[in-house]
Structures are given as structure tokens and as C-alpha cells.
Amino acid sequence: GRIGTVKVTAGRYNDAFAESNIYDNRVDGIKLGVNLGHASYLVGAYGKMASADVSSAPGSTGISAAGRYARAALGGEWGRFDGEINYVKAKDVMNMGKQGSDDKIWSVGTNYKLGKLKVGAMYLQGDNDVVDAYGGSDWGTVYSLRYGASDKKKTGSWGLFTQYFNQGAATVISHPMYGDTKSFPLEGYKGYVVGGNVTLAPNMV
């Protein structure tokens, strides 16, 4: 709901940080969003990650990817461009082999839209003691290209997409991509994905 000009989301809900490149899963928390005008916004959030994710630690099925977290984001749109800066601090991170350590991640990303075509790029920087001790990478980049998009209410709507990821373990907590991101947990992952979606019937994508 809203309290004056502030949009409030509270309880258990799904949230995505940095276009899902840092985290995309359930949280128990509160998120406040303020429209700053001129298509810009400010977001602040605090809570606990409630992902019930499968961490890379042996026998840890069902353990959440991380514990408490705080997040701040600033973004907006300028003509054909949109962009967002994120900062996330998470405690007790289990995913990506981080063994319950703390993780600090910031990102800056932008997209350019031309008709149905959308091109994006993002840079991420992480800080995690376990990854540092291992000698793993603490930075990452993501590039994306999209054409069109499916609309769950519009039968026959469709979209195509491709993304390239090069993310060190320190830059990600829980990623929703179709692929094995945990085979070499402290190394992070590198590769691309290609896909598409189409709405066959209302609410059937």
C-alpha cells in the first residue's frame, strides 16, 4: 500500500535486486519506494532472505541463501535510457560457497530501448572475505539483448532474449537463471543464455 508518497511493501514477497543478477527470490521484510519525479525513484529495504535455496554446502538442502539484508537503490528513465544503482549488504550468506560470511555488493546498470529492441549492460562489484581468501573474483559484468516481450494477458504476444554473464562469486547471492551456477561456487560463473517466451492463452506463458 501507500503512506502518503511512499509505496510500502511488507511481509513475505518475491523481490529482485539488480535485474535479478544479485538476488531474485523470496524475502521477509519491508521495502519503501519513493517517486522522486522525472521518472526517477529511490528504494530502501530491510529484512531476511527467505529463499529456502539449496546452497553449495554439502547436505544443506533447504537452507536459505543468506540471512538479514539491507538494500538501497536509485534509478530512473531518461528518454530511451533507463538505469539503476544498487547497494546490498547481506549477512550469513551460504550460497556460492560463502560459508555464512557477510557479502557487500553494489551494481550499476543501464538499458537502451529502441522500439521493441532493448540492449543492456551492468557492472557489479562484491566484497566477501571467504571469496577473497580463496582468490576468487569480486567483480562481474552482464550484457543483455531483448526483442519484444510476452504479455500474460495477451494471447500470441512473444519475446526473444539473450544474456552473457561473467560474474565472480562475490557479486551474486541467488540467481534464477536456467543453469548450474554452483558447480564451482567460489569461482562464480561465465556463459550465455538464449531463450524466448510466448503467451499461448491468458495466463499461460
Describe the role of every protein-language-model region.
Residues 1-57, 66-86, 111, 137-176:
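Outer membrane beta-barrel
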Residues 79-82, 87, 91-205:
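Outer-membrane beta-barrel pore domains
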